[in-house]
Amino acid sequence: MSEYRAQKELKPKVEDIARELLDEDKLANVLAFLEFLKNNKLTPRWYTSDSWVVKYKNKTVCKIKLNWMPRSSDKGNFWGIYSAHFTRENWFENYDSYITDDGLKAFIWDHINPPHGCSQQGGTVRCKGWPNVTILGKTYKAVCGCHSLVVKNPDGKTLEYAKEFVLVIKTFIADLAVAGQA
């Protein structure tokens, strides 16, 4: 049975797969992030092989992915937090009032993901990115349309900013719901 089929049947928890794949330091960071999510009433749900989606009010907050670096020497010892919030439904235009901390802005700018031919199907590139995107006052030539923000192996301050970003998204989604737009 393929890994995908096995996981689809079992729908494993992030921590169970993380314990199999990650070294001690990266595992500790994943577990800290999962504890943060739990404390904020956010639960990762299995999405696809080694990937979980975190939703709030039925809107995606982020995805957690393990083992997603096939061209890397780190394969099998990788985790990341992925978000598409800077390209979907023009949400990026509305974040200015939510993100005022310069450190958080710098974190976001440092983790914007350029298009790289992801989502290939049968040799056809489905994701060509979004051209000329301005995020929090900084313009990018192009941003990945699948995962506009990618935080690879976060730890320390990077992990703290990732948590802060998740709270911003949750607050934004809650405000949309109150306004009847979610």
Locate predicted features.
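Terminal, regulation- and interaction-focused segments at domain boundaries
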Residues: M1-F36, N40
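Short, conserved beta-strand/beta-arch hydrophobic-aromatic motifs that form part
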Residues: Y47-G180
